[in-house]
């Protein structure tokens, strides 16, 4: 009987130690917020410098995509700007299959911004039967995220 009472207390103590360690790690990360922000800003600045010096449409597209990723959970309106730039340069690439990826990324940015209905409208433009395996996965993940955000919001 004594063991039945002590054993759960022992497990609780171990979990408490683990929780303290996790909280300490989180506190350490939060205390370095400014450092992480400076790193992110440097990465974004470096990408913009490369973009300013690039004349190749393929390279510009890649840089727009990188800027989208760098901005998505940082400044989603800027992420949306670079997605729109990708769409503008798309005709020069002669790769129409990228249009669906751009639409999915636009929907993702809109969802992050709280524009859930607009995000769903973007996704509705896509015929999933036309997507390759990777893009189809991204399509459904974005739909799932939008429905999750809508559920959280309502």
Task: Walk through the language-model features, giving the residues of each.
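A "functional boundary" signal
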Residues: 2-4, 10-154
